[in-house]
């Protein structure tokens, strides 16, 4: 029965994609005027955007991708059922090994993500940072050493999506692989979960499009398609069911969008969604390393009509409406204004994400000794 449903889903999506193309992907006069205005008034956009392709073609493909991704999302949400065997963990500890902000001069920050997650059953490495200097040891490995963490301590690795700031550097992206330093080391007998077909020497990474349990009380929430003007990416997040609390959703970049992360989690888990922690890509203003071009990578948004403060405020209100009790926003892809908006709303229930600072659900943040 499940195979028939999957086949039917594929047929429906294909038909919708054809309908979308038949409606016309050629830019309207208004759309072309918006693109031309951006190219003529924003030198950074005019210089950088051709590196991704012809601007008109990018826009036309983006229009197709929006319809296709929405159709896939609706079909997946209809198809997916509740995970019956998620289980629970009494232990939840998360340590940002790489993130955008560090308050310790001995621990490197960079515009990337790598989180260590400990539960009763497993130690999980979620993403592997950016490695800006392309060095060995990488900032990730140096931070791990200073925190007393070894690669041998890690049982499971999960990659959220194939962007350079999550797979260990841009050079690995076209190869559909990843690395914890500037060359690929022996990872031993780790189980690795990826959001698209990826490889690693000596390993067989597991690609599961649908949600999958990876340890007792821990699962991925499945792949969600994320259409952006300059590219398309598939991203997955991790969910941890903590005893006495509920499900904590941990996101890498949040290209899925906050609303879809919540909707998917509420769809597949019978337990309440307790918290949302990680990267959510909310670059409204320029701050630290968050530059204007970060706004070009917002899912479903045009570079000249990108995320606004009102959008962020709506996300805050949505999480409160859904009774999400704790929130923590990564500084690697969100600006200070967005972080402060969530801090103001959540107050003592807001979790600061600083490199090396341990997060537990008993005490929201304490220094890892």
Annotate each PLM feature.
Residues 136-190, 267-281:
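Active-site metal-binding motif and surrounding structural segment of the metallo-beta-lactamase
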Residues 156, 244-248, 256-360:
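Cap/insert and terminal regions of metallo-dependent hydrolase folds
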Residues 181-238, 351-362:
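Metallo-beta-lactamase
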């Amino acid at each position: 029965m499940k195979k028939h449903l999957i086949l039917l889903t594929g047929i429906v999506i294909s038909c919708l994609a054809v309908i979308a193309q038949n409606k016309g992907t050629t830019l309207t006069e208004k759309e072309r005027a918006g693109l031309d205005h951006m190219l003529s008034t924003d030198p950074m956009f005019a210089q950088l955007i051709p590196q991704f392709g012809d601007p008109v073609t990018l826009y036309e493909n983006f229009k197709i991708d929006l319809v296709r991704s929405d159709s896939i999302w609706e079909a997946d949400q209809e198809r997916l059922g509740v995970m019956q065997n998620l289980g629970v963990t009494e232990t939840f500890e998360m340590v940002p090994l790489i993130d955008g902000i560090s308050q310790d001069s001995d621990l490197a920050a960079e515009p990337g993500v790598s989180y260590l997650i400990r539960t009763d059953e497993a130690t999980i490495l979620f993403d592997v940072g950016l490695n800006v200097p392309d060095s060995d040891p990488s900032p990730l490995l140096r931070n791990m050493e200073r925190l007393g963490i070894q690669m041998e301590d890690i049982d499971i690795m999960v990659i959220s999506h194939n962007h350079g700031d999550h797979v260990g550097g841009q050079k690995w992206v076209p190869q559909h692989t990843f690395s914890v330093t500037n060359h690929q080391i022996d990872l031993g007998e780790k189980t690795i979960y990826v959001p698209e077909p990826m490889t690693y020497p000596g390993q067989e990474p597991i690609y599961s499009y649908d949600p999958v349990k990876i340890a007792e009380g821990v699962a991925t929430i499945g792949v969600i398609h994320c259409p952006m003007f300059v590219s398309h990416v598939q991203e997955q997040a991790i969910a941890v069911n903590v005893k006495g609390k509920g499900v904590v959703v941990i996101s890498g970049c949040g290209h899925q969008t906050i609303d879809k992360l919540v909707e998917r989690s509420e769809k597949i888990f019978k337990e309440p969604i307790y918290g949302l922690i990680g990267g959510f890509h909310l670059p409204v203003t320029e701050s630290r390393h968050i530059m204007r071009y970060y706004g070009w990578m917002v899912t479903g948004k045009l570079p000249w009509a990108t995320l606004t403060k009102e959008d962020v405020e709506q996300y805050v209100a949505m999480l409160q409406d859904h009774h999400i009790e704790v929130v923590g926003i990564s500084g690697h892809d969100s600006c200070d204004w967005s972080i402060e908006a969530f801090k103001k709303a959540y107050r003592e229930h807001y979790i600061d994400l600083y490199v090396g600072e341990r997060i537990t659900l008993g005490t929201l943040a304490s220094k890892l000794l």
